[in-house]
Swiss-Prot record:
GTP 2 binds at residues 181-188, 228-232, 293-296. It comes from Mycoplasma mycoides subsp. mycoides SC (strain CCUG 32753 / NCTC 10114 / PG1). The gene is der. This is GTPase Der. GTP 1 binds at residues 10-17, 57-61, 119-122. Pfam families: KH_dom-like, MMR_HSR1.
């Protein structure tokens, strides 16, 4: 089922980030220090009463005080476009100001569910200006304290009620493909080439935003849906705000896809924006194909192809399993080869490993390369089995997971990956203590 987006919006210093951290139950730093990945942390997967959703913290946006009102308005408009449910946060301890009222006015014009969260409420304060908040005109109104946890459960119950109300279960057996990349790498050209090449468009499904369209088509008797084909249109007046929110659009597409196509421009160096997008794919553990577009514009192709591959591998070490393909979306060169790779990946995802064969591979791996001592002891794996999941997932029962060094985990991943043909997809190893 598609994950819905819940956006927390409001002016600075009303407690958006505190509410974000309270809901996801842990503190997130602004910079996420993963190997090769550094990015603004304005989103997280969240869960309440077994329902999962994507939570967005707009507090990650820095605002130039001279452009304060303009930036607030832009922030609000983008949140409306992206979100399925909006939590509008105001400050109980301070009177409403013009920016609160401006946000409220914009939200009333939208068709999105809005929940008013009146933060910094401690139950002891005299409620002498509650009428101010009621005058904002929102029927869903909750007094909360993100610091002390007051009212958070009731707030999330309301969020989930809107998410559940909007759920529609449609039987769809097509493979969902997200085409992701920074502006002007040729995403739209690739979509057009895929669709026009096959000339078998099944449907165009309007998305939740004005400019998002999912396109379905068939190729070699397989059904495909390219999801979230429209990106946020880059407008100079939006500047960095749009760049940050483009990650939200990308995250939504990645989360709800089966396979991701990460597009880069063959004529330009790889940028932080490229690797940031790669980081989203890594976080979501999605199969990915790196599509190098505009290869027709490159001179000395035979000489340059190895250099480009080396550059890509160096920048995207954390998704080393990704296949790389060089194409020209405009000329339709090798475009259908992408779908052949997608079909191969789908086949790999369906492989089920027999338990006894898996344990033979792991026993052999431990013989040829015993686990190093770590945290005062040595890891010992007793047995393992594959469990049901979209990507190949294996539970390894051991003496204690704390004895696992990350380098040895990578070694075991590689042993499983190449023993069972998982070389082009992510796999997941879960270590559990044997009771």
């Amino acid at each position: 089922m598609k994950k819905k987006i819940v956006a927390i919006i409001g002016r600075p210093n009303v407690g958006k980030s505190s509410l974000f951290n309270r809901i996801i139950k842990e503190k997130k730093s602004i910079v996420d220090n993963k190997p090769g990945v550094t990015r603004d942390r304005i989103y997280s997967n969240a869960e309440w009463l077994t329902r999962e959703f994507i939570l967005v913290d707009t507090g990650g946006i820095s605002i130039d005080q001279q452009l304060f009102s303009n930036e607030i308005q832009i922030q609000t408009q983008i949140a409306i476009e992206q979100a399925d449910v909006i939590i509008f946060v105001v400050d109980f301890l301070n009177r409403l100001d013009k920016d609160d009222k401006m946000i409220a006015k914009i939200l009333h014009k939208s068709k999105k569910p809005v929940i008013l969260a009146i933060n910094k409420y401690d139950k002891k304060t005299i409620d002498d200006h509650n009428y101010e908040f009621m005058n904002l005109g929102f029927s869903d109104l909750y007094f909360i304290s993100s610091t002390h946890g007051i009212g958070i459960g009731d707030l999330l119950d309301k969020v989930i009620s809107y998410i559940s109300k909007n759920d529609v279960d449609l039987k769809d057996d097509s493979t969902k493909i997200a085409i992701i990349g920074r502006p002007n790498v040729g995403k739209s050209s690739l979509v057009n080439s895929l669709v026009n090449e096959n000339r078998m468009i099944v449907s165009e499904i309007e998305g939740t935003t004005l400019d998002a369209v999912d396109i379905s088509f068939s190729y070699n008797k397989n059904k495909y849906t390219v999801i979230d084909t429209a990106g946020i249109r880059k407008k100079s007046k939006l500047g960095q705000t749009v760049e940050k929110y483009s990650y939200l659009r990308s995250l939504s597409a990645i989360t709800n896809s089966d396979i991701v196509l990460l597009m880069i421009d063959a004529t330009k160096p790889i940028t932080d924006q490229d690797t940031n997008i790669g980081g989203l794919i890594y976080d979501e553990k999605k199969p990915v194909i790196i599509v190098v577009n505009k290869w027709d514009l490159v001179k000395n192709k035979q000489e340059q192809i190895l250099k480009k591959e080396e550059e890509i591998r160096a920048y995207f070490k954390y998704i080393s399993y990704a296949k790389i393909i060089f194409i020209s979306a405009l000329d339709k060169t090798r475009v259908t080869k992408i779908l052949d790779l997608v079909a191969d990946i789908k086949q790999s995802l369906s492989v089920k490993v027999k338990t006894y064969v898996l344990n033979e591979v792991l026993n052999k791996a431990q013989l040829i390369n015993p686990a190093p001592e770590f945290n005062g002891n040595r890891l010992k794996i007793y047995y393992a089995s594959q469990v049901q999941a979209y990507i190949p997932t294996f539970v390894l029962f051991c003496n204690h997971p704390n004895y696992l060094h990350f380098s040895y985990k990578r070694f075991l991943e590689n042993q499983i990956r190449f023993s069972f043909g998982f070389d082009s997809i992510p796999i997941n190893l879960i270590f559990r203590e044997r009771k």
